[in-house]
């Protein structure tokens, strides 16, 4: 069949983007070195954001400091990559998503359906809140999220 040239163009744009990011983290002129540098920098930044979310930043408590918060996959999860799945005890995940979205913080619900059921069903969970971080997010955004969680927990 005919090749999907749009997919190739998109893939090329993604590779070019990673090369551009990598230029900020290496002086090498080699394209592969730049892409590797981008991947390493992105991983380090996302880990820093995830650690701030779990353990706190500045004078803000992290999610692991709230008795009311359960972190799916555990706090000390070396395989965690820029994502925290969580619940607040006694609060419906959909209600938490709405509360955070109402504060301008975009998070998503994951339900025990065809998409996430293979994880949530064995844990006996009907749903959870998924918080994703990426290389373009900042520690200030994590702080805003933690402030919102603090306020939501305090209001319960």
Language-model region placement:
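Pyridoxal 5′-phosphate
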Residues: 1-156
């Amino acid at each position: 069949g005919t090749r999907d040239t749009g997919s190739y163009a998109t893939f090329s744009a993604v590779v070019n983007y990673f090369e551009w990011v990598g230029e900020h983290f290496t002086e090498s002129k080699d394209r592969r070195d730049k892409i590797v540098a981008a991947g390493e920098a992105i991983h380090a930044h996302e880990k820093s954001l995830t650690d701030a979310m779990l353990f706190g930043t500045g004078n803000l408590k992290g999610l692991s400091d709230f008795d009311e918060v359960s972190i799916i996959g555990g706090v000390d999860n070396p395989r965690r990559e820029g994502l925290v799945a969580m619940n607040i005890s006694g609060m419906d995940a959909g209600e938490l998503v709405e509360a955070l979205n109402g504060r301008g913080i975009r998070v998503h619900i994951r339900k025990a359906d065809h998409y996430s059921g293979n994880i949530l069903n064995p844990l006996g969970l009907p749903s959870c809140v998924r918080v994703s971080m990426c290389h373009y997010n900042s520690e200030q955004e994590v702080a805003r999220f933690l402030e919102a969680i603090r306020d939501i927990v305090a209001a319960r």
